[in-house]
């Protein structure tokens, strides 16, 4: 940044010097035209921080939640506002208003337990939901304000949170980190994120073709507040049918259209095909269906459909009513029918049919399911809104039942106060919301929606892993199927989704991440837009006759035809002009589609969009003056929108635009300019320096490893008590930064250290990416980290008034504590700072033996017997007690948390990685005296084998080394931003100026012989991350140990001190070697040898020398077999299969 300002100053001075008037009269001045912009090319990235202040990254979650709390809740209440009683017609209860977290009377918010306290005390961070109600009591109508009906979990940093708009000092008071992204919930003390869910868009027609079966189908998923259903228009043997789940069989399309009131075949033909003869030829065959079935009137058609409806209702309707009901409410449910006027629905079905006919005529006219414009992203707000509405309906139902129960009794009916029973059910809403968020299972009765894995625990491995989790998109696609379509990188994802950040393995391409400048829209009202369209010259669809429908472009609002327009281009331009002047919401998109002759307007939520600079007449509208005002704080990002300099485009509208990547590329026909090209990457991929010089999978690997790097987590990391925390002791910010690093504040909470690296071979312990580390560097703290583990204990209270207690420590005859209790304090808890070794106790808890007995009312002072239930430390290395916290949980039980700390220095086998997807383990640690050094006496911290470069092609790593070296010598932090950054020539020039080699190679001397090495060595700083995979956590061996109860074989897994299994493949290998005794020893003697008595005669097993089958003891032979084999034989016997052992003597006499 400093360097940039210096450069800018010199630039301005030059202009002052050369301000001679005659120079300016020449057409070209200093290589620039007069009309050229000054310096904007470098400066327009200042729009990025301005954008991230208002939108982007985590703001999507917050906006969505705020919209739900402020707008959606009120809509839900309005839809379900009345509760009436079946018993007493006089009674009613009406919800007037709803608020979260603040009462109507006082302007202040309620006191909420601060989020940090909720984390420590295992509570839920939530605010009360208040309603104002009006109801009858006897003859009176009563208004009641601020009735609490439950508690709503609050998203951190949303507008109902304490941290909303808090400055740094207030954050510090609340023990919160100002850089923490927010956007998650705290439920029972754990941080839960609702991931962005990806789905196909609702209420839109999607045409697909199945080439194998030769089927073309158009489907639309209708989603309303009451129901979700899918309607298909499909082809079968060249004829077209309508299909719906609630109708038993497919119905010919002509009959459906007749049922909707379009009776003449000519009109059906006009609606579907217009004047296009080729479409008419394809469609004509469908008109015969109705005459075959003798259906000519609307009533006949409705009866035909009614007969086919699957009935689920209790009261019987006539066939005609069934048909009307099906067409009015079931088929294409998102269109409402008023006064039995089916015209709109007929047009919609005709449009679907037309799309099918077009696809039959031209197979290219089908839609792509994986195209980003056909997808919608669901955010936390929408998901909780569905959940809350479900719970609220259930709450009202239970409420009504309990009111009816009371009103039925004749004596109580006079003065019944409904308020008394509202509190009984209020727990339903609270626990329903909490359960859904903590388990991640969304099950809604109305939609038959069952979804698992919606929420995840926020990963706090590093600051980046938490941030990356907020931008993750999970798609509801089965991971097991190996389909390449949805996993592929779509061109429409450009700028919307990060190209590099996706996991490898089965979820590859299904789990995506948002790019840096994306925003996800929320719903906007449709009605005003509809009116606006009619004002701008759209003819209302209900007034157009069928014949002229297809002569002009159709206008669609959220997929529904609302009219037609004669001059589409003019209409689109006018509409965009209104949007740019701020008369219409900036997130509404409009685009024309010439293939379908349609103009589409979209106002629905869940579309991905991103901001672009508007270009008019070959000039970027953002001028230098605007950027200066932005830097001075006179303008913010919203002003740029209002002034019509910047606008949001979604994927569909991007297809209508011509976008320049750089200002120098602008030609007159272009419509937009990218704000910055590097924003096609997301937050995690933005950390990589010079990613455009790397092979693409390397960037993908780094995205996965950057989330596992140990570093600083948050400013409040020492106040937190998490299950497992990894912290680096001396994190450094990288020498080579990127713009993204500054934007997401990674330089304030970094995860890694700048290591001096020599690229050379040393010792042979560096084969296959292993690293050679310098022992002295480790002594000085390179790569040192600490782990913190939490143990939680609850002191329970039992029904019979007994409770768990913490005992004191035991002492020996000298008055010293016994070895097991050495780390305890006098109160029976570990003392802070004490060392705990494996086998020592650090919480000395005792439990009453009679806790299960019934409460004893008579003799209260019975002496309670306790047995010890201490918490014992188990671990290969000793730990230190870091914090002890005592508190009270929600249900008034004492809660004790102890945090254990371990300091770790790097050892052989610990995993490191650079920022270019090059991971390696530490292969050997060498003393500084034996390491090579250069003529200034600098010794590398890491020696890396040069064979890591050729096949990986990570040129970015080499450039990072040169930039970092130049930065160190020059005293600046260099930039390795994608598609930009510090130029290699400039860096090399700095190296030469400072007396180093142009290519970053140095002369090194051997540390062993002191002679000069025979080659120049590539030598300089590279940013290295220490990953969470450490040997100490994985090391495992076993000689003897526990065995499983059932099979009597050694247990499995490191945590249970399990054995190492010699599996099937290893067994085959041993057989191939012919080492049969080894096989016997491993698979039986050392595993689960067992002596059985086998009867030679019948081949079944007996016991203690007696064959139970033959009832004799003659032919019993003792032999050793694996216990698992004996178990198998007995299990087979229980299933009526008799495995008989045929024995023969090996050593025949």
Curated annotation (Swiss-Prot):
Which positions are annotated as binding Zn(2+)? 1095, 1098, 1107, 1110
Annotated GO molecular function terms are: DNA binding; DNA-directed RNA polymerase activity; ribonucleoside binding; zinc ion binding
Question: What's a single GO CC term here?
Answer: nucleoplasm
Catalysed conversion reaction: RNA(n) + a ribonucleoside 5'-triphosphate = RNA(n+1) + diphosphate
Q: What is the annotated localization of this protein?
A: Nucleus
Cystines in this chain: none
Record-level GO BP terms: termination of RNA polymerase III transcription; transcription by RNA polymerase III; transcription initiation at RNA polymerase III promoter; tRNA transcription by RNA polymerase III
Q: Could you tell me which CDD domains the record lists for this protein?
A: RNA_pol_B_RPB2 (cd00653)
Described purpose of this protein according to its UniProt entry? DNA-dependent RNA polymerase catalyzes the transcription of DNA into RNA using the four ribonucleoside triphosphates as substrates. Second largest core component of RNA polymerase III which synthesizes small RNAs, such as 5S rRNA and tRNAs. Proposed to contribute to the polymerase catalytic activity and forms the polymerase active center together with the largest subunit. Pol III is composed of mobile elements and RPC2 is part of the core element with the central large cleft and probably a clamp element that moves to open and close the cleft.
Record family assignment:
Belongs to the RNA polymerase beta chain family.
Which PANTHER family is this protein grouped with?
A: DNA-DIRECTED RNA POLYMERASE I SUBUNIT 2
Q: What is this protein called?
A: DNA-directed RNA polymerase III subunit RPC2
Organism, scientific name: Saccharomyces cerevisiae (strain ATCC 204508 / S288c)
């Amino acid at each position: 940044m400093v360097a940039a300002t210096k450069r800018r100053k010199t630039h301005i001075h030059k202009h002052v010097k050369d301000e001679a008037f005659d120079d300016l009269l020449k057409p070209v001045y200093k290589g620039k035209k007069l009309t050229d912009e000054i310096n904007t090319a470098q400066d327009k990235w200042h729009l990025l921080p301005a954008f991230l202040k208002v939108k982007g990254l985590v703001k999507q979650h917050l906006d969505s939640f705020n919209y739900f709390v402020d707008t959606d809740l009120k809509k839900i209440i309005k839809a379900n506002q009345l509760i009436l009683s079946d018993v007493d017609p006089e009674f009613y209860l009406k919800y007037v208003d709803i608020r979260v977290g603040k009462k109507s009377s006082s302007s202040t918010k309620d006191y909420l337990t601060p989020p940090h306290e909720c984390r420590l005390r295992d509570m839920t961070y939530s605010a009360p939901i208040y309603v104002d109600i009006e109801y009858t009591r006897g003859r009176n109508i009563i208004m009641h304000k601020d009735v609490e009906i439950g508690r709503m979990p609050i998203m951190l940093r949303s507008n109902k949170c304490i941290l909303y708009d808090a400055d740094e000092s207030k954050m510090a008071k609340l023990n919160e980190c100002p850089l923490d992204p927010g956007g998650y919930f705290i439920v029972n003390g754990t941080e839960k994120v609702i991931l962005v869910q990806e789905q196909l868009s609702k209420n839109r027609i999607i045409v697909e073709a199945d080439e194998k079966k030769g089927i073309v189908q158009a489907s639309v998923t209708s989603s309303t507040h009451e129901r979700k259903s899918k309607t298909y228009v499909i082809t079968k043997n060249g004829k077209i049918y309508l299909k719906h789940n609630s109708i038993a069989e497919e119905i010919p399309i002509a009959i459906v259209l007749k049922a909707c009131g379009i009776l003449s075949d000519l009109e059906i033909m006009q609606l579907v095909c217009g004047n296009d003869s080729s479409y008419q030829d394809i469609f004509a065959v469908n008109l015969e269906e109705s005459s075959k079935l003798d259906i000519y009137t609307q009533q006949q058609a409705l009866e035909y459909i009614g007969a086919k409806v699957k009935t689920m209702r209790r009261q019987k309707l006539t066939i005609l009513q069934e048909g009307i009901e099906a067409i009015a409410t079931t088929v294409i449910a998102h269109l409402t029918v008023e006064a039995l006027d089916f015209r709109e629905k007929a047009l919609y079905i005709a449009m679907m049919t037309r799309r099918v006919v077009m696809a039959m005529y031209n197979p290219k006219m089908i839609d792509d399911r994986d195209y980003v414009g056909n997808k919608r992203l669901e955010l936390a707000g929408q998901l909780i809104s569905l959940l809350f509405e479900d719970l609220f309906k259930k709450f009202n139902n239970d409420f009504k039942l309990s009111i009816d129960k009371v009103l039925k009794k004749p004596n109580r009916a006079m003065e019944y106060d409904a308020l008394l029973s509202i509190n009984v059910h209020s727990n339903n809403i609270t626990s329903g919301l909490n359960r859904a968020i903590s388990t991640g299972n969304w099950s809604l009765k109305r939609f038959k929606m069952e979804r698992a894995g919606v929420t995840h625990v926020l990963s706090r491995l590093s600051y980046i892993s938490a941030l990356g989790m907020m931008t993750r998109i999970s798609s509801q696609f089965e991971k097991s199927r190996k389909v390449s379509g949805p996993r592929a990188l779509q061109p429409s994802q450009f700028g919307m989704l990060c190209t590099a950040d996706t996991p490898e393995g089965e979820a590859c391409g299904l789990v995506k991440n948002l790019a840096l400048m994306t925003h996800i829209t929320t719903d906007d009202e449709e009605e005003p837009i509809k009116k606006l369209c009619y004002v701008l010259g759209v003819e209302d669809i209900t007034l157009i006759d069928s014949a002229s429908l297809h002569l002009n472009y159709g206008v669609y609002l959220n997929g529904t035809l609302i009219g037609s327009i004669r001059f589409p281009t003019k209409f689109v331009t006018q509409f965009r002009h209104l949007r740019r002047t701020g008369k219409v919401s900036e997130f509404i998109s409009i685009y024309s589609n010439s293939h379908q002759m349609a103009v589409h307007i979209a106002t629905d939520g869940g579309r991905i969009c991103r901001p672009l600079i508007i270009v008019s007449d070959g000039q970027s509208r953002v001028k230098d003056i605007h950027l200066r005002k932005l830097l001075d704080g006179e303008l913010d990002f919203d002003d740029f929108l209002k002034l019509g300099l910047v606008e949001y485009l979604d994927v569909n509208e991007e297809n209508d635009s011509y976008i320049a990547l750089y200002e120098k590329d602008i030609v007159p026909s272009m419509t937009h300019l990218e704000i910055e090209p590097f924003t096609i990457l997301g937050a995690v991929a933005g950390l990589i320096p010079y990613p455009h010089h790397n092979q693409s999978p390397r960037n993908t690997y780094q995205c996965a490893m950057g989330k596992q790097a140990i570093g600083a987590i948050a400013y409040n990391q020492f106040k937190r008590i998490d299950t497992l925390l990894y912290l680096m002791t001396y994190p450094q910010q990288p020498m080579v930064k990127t713009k993204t690093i500054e934007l997401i504040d990674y330089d304030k909470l970094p995860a890694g250290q700048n290591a001096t690296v020599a690229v050379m071979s040393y010792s042979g312990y560096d084969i296959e990416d292993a690293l050679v580390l310098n022992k002295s560097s480790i002594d000085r703290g390179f790569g040192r980290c600490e782990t913190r583990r939490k143990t939680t204990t609850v002191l329970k209270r039992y029904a019979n008034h007994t409770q768990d207690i913490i005992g004191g420590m035991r002492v020996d005859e000298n008055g010293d504590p016994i070895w097991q209790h050495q780390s305890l304090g006098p109160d029976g808890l570990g003392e802070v700072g004490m060392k705990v070794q494996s086998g020592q106790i650090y919480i000395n808890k005792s439990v009453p033996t009679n806790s299960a007995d019934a409460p004893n009312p008579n003799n209260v002072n019975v002496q309670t017997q306790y047995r010890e239930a201490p918490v014992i430390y188990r671990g290969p290395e000793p730990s230190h007690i870091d914090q002890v916290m005592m508190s009270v949980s929600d249900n008034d039980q004492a809660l004790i948390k102890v945090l254990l700390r371990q300091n770790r220095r790097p050892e052989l086998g610990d995993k490191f990685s650079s920022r270019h997807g090059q991971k390696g383990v530490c292969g050997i640690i060498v003393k500084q005296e034996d390491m090579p050094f250069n003529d200034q006496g600098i010794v590398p911290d890491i020696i890396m084998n040069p064979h890591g470069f050729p096949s990986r092609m990570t040129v970015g790593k080499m450039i990072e080394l040169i930039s970092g070296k130049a930065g160190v010598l020059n005293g600046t932090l260099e930039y390795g931003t994608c598609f930009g950054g510090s130029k290699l020539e400039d860096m090399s020039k700095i190296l030469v100026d400072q007396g180093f080699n142009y290519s970053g190679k140095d002369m090194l001397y051997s540390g062993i012989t002191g002679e000069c090495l025979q080659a120049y060595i590539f030598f300089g700083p590279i940013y290295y991350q220490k990953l969470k995979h450490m040997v100490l956590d994985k090391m495992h061996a076993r000689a003897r140990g526990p065995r499983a109860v059932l099979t009597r074989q050694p247990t499995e897994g490191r945590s249970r001190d399990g054995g190492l299994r010699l599996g099937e493949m290893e067994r085959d290998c041993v057989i191939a070697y012919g080492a049969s005794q080894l096989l016997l020893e491993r698979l039986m003697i050392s595993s689960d040898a067992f002596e059985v008595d086998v009867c030679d005669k019948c081949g079944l097993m007996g016991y203690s020398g007696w064959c139970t089958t033959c009832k004799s003891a003659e032919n019993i032979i003792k032999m050793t077999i694996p216990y698992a084999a004996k178990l198998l034989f007995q299990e087979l016997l229980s299933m009526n299969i008799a495995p008989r052992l045929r024995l023969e003597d090996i050593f025949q006499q």
